[in-house]
Amino acid sequence: MTELSIRPDEIRDALQRFVSEYQPDAASKEEVGTVAQAGDGIARVSGLPSAMANELLEFEDGTMGLALNLDTREIGVVILGDFEGIEEGQTVRRTGEILSVPVGDNFMGRVVDPLGKPIDGLGEIEAETRRALELQAPTVMQRKSVHEPLATGIKAIDSMTPIGRGQRQLIIGDRATGKTTIAIDTIINQKQNWESGDPAKQVRCIYVAIGQKGSTIASVRGALEEAGALEYTTIVASPASDSAGFKYLAPYTGSAIGQHWMYDGKHVLIIFDDLTKQAEAYRAVSLLLRRPPGREAYPGDVFYLHSRLLERCAKLSDDMGAGSMTGLPIIETKANDVSAYIPTNVISITDGQIFLQSDLFASNQRPAIDVGVSVSRVGGSAMTKAMKAVTGSLKVDLAQFRAMEAFAMFASDLDAASRQQLDRGQRLMALLKQPAYSPYPVEEMTVSLWLGTSGRLDKVPTEDVLRFEREFLDFLRRSHEGILSAIRETLKFEDDTESSLEDAYNSFLDQFQTSEGGSIKVGHEPEAEALADEDVEQEQIVRQKRG
C-alpha cells in the first residue's frame, strides 16, 4: 500500500498562483421591490424609492410593467402583457429605461403590437433604432405652415374639406357610418405616389387599431393587401382582448414609428382608430390606480392625453428636413352628440373635422359627410389650383340644398330658382356618392366635379348621374387622354384645358343615352305630348285662379 505523501511546495505554489490570478466580481447594487397587490392589469409595488415616472419595471416572470403612479409608499404599475402569473410577494426590479419601441423601414407591411413585436407570424423585424414613446412634439420654430395637399381620393373631402400634409383632421360620427372606410380609402389613394418612387411624393402610412375586434383588423389588413397598399403601411394592433394598458399605449407606438420617418425628411400618414376607445382605456387604468375622476369619470389629464399625441403631427421646417406627419384621428359619437367630453376635446385640438351623419348613411349617401358641419381650417391653403377652379361655391350650394331639402316635397309650388337649386343639389349629392375602397385620381376628380358645378349634369336624370360620370371618364381615357394628363401633370385647370373638355363633353353627348333611352343634347329632346281635353280644362282653371 503506497503511502500518501504531502508536498508542501506544490500546495504553496498552487495557492500563490490562485491568489495572483483571482479577480473579484465588481460589487453591484440593485433596487428590488415587492408586489404588494396585483389584479386587473395593475400591480402595486412597495420599495423602489428611486423609480422614475414611466420607467419600465421587470417582474419575476419576465413580464414588463410601466410605473405610472409614484406614491409615497407604493408605485402604481400598469402591467404590459399577461398578468396571470404575477402574485403578491414576488420581486420587482428596476430597468432604468423609459418605454421605447423599435422603428425603421422594415416595419412597413407588418402588423405589430404596442411594444413593437410582430404578431402577423412573418418572423422577427430587424429594427434600425429605438424611439421613446413619450417624446416631445416639434416646437413652434421647427414647424412650417401646411401648404402641400394630401389627396384622399374622396370627392366630398378633397373638394370641400381638403387635407394638407402635417394637418390633424378629425373624422367623427356614430358607429357604422363609414369612418374607417374613409381612412382606408386615404391609405389606398397613396399607392400612385408610392409607385412613382419620388421621395417627395411618397407617403408612408400607419394604421393604429385601438380596441377593435380581431376580425375587423384582419379585414382591414386584407383590404390593404388586396389594393396593393400594405407594402407602405404599418398596422399597430391592440385588439379588444388586450389589456387597458396596451390600448392606452398603442397610439403612442404608432406615433413613435411615424416620427422616426418624419424627422428623416419623409412624409407620413397616421390613422388613430379610434381615440374614444383609448380614452376609455385610460379612464379604466386611472380609476384602477385610484386617481380622482372628473367629468364623465375621466381623469383630469385626459385632454393632455390626446393633445400631446396629436401635437406630434406636424409639417417640419426646411431646416428640419421638411418631413411631415398627417394625423386622422377617429372619434365615435353617441346619437350624433358632438358636445360630449371627448369629442369636444379632440375638436379643439385638431385643425378641422369631417362629420358623418347616420341619417345620410341610412339614405345610401356614402360617404355620409355632412358638408354643413364639416370644416378644414388649414387645408384650403394646400388645395390644388385645379380643384380650386372647379369647386367654387360647391360647399355653400350643398349646405343651402340641405337646408332647402325639407321643402322638396312642395317642389310644384316653389319658384323656378328654388326648383333649379333643388335639382342641382340632388345631382351634386348623387355625384358625390362613392363606393368603398375606390379612390379617384386627382385628374378624374377634377373632371367629375367640373361636370357637377358647371351645370353640365342639370339635364341628366338623377339616377343616371354616376353612370354618365363613369362613361364620360371612360370616353376621355380612350379618346382625350391629353386632357387628363394635362391636369395630372400641372395640377391646374387652364382655359385651354376647359375648352378642350367642353368639346369632348359635346362629342360625348351624341352617344350618351339616359336609362329611358332618350338624349340630353339640346335639340334632341322628345316632343311634348299633347294634353288631354280634361287636362287642358284643369290648366285653364288653375291659370284663372292665379290670374
UniProtKB/Swiss-Prot annotation:
Keywords: ATP synthesis, ATP-binding, Cell membrane, CF(1), Hydrogen ion transport, Ion transport, Membrane, Nucleotide-binding, Translocase, Transport. GO terms for molecular function: ADP binding; ATP binding; proton-transporting ATP synthase activity, rotational mechanism. Its EC number is 7.1.2.2. It is a peripheral membrane protein. CDD domains: ATP-synt_F1_alpha_C (cd18113), ATP-synt_F1_alpha_N (cd18116), F1-ATPase_alpha_CD (cd01132). Residues 526-547 are annotated as: Disordered. It comes from Nocardioides sp. (strain ATCC BAA-499 / JS614). NCBIfam families: atpA, PRK13343.1. Produces ATP from ADP in the presence of a proton gradient across the membrane. The alpha chain is a regulatory subunit. F-type ATPases have 2 components, CF(1) - the catalytic core - and CF(0) - the membrane proton channel. CF(1) has five subunits: alpha(3), beta(3), gamma(1), delta(1), epsilon(1). CF(0) has three main subunits: a(1), b(2) and c(9-12). The alpha and beta chains form an alternating ring which encloses part of the gamma chain. CF(1) is attached to CF(0) by a central stalk formed by the gamma and epsilon chains, while a peripheral stalk is formed by the delta and b chains. The record marks 374 as: Required for activity. It is found in: Cell membrane. ATP binds at residues 173-180. Residues 528-538 have a biased composition (Acidic residues). Belongs to the ATPase alpha/beta chains family. It catalyses: ATP + H2O + 4 H(+)(in) = ADP + phosphate + 5 H(+)(out). It is an enzyme of class 7 (translocase). Transmembrane segments: none annotated. GO terms for cellular component: plasma membrane; proton-transporting ATP synthase complex. PROSITE patterns: ATPASE_ALPHA_BETA. Pfam families: ATP-synt_ab, ATP-synt_ab_C, ATP-synt_ab_N. This is ATP synthase subunit alpha.
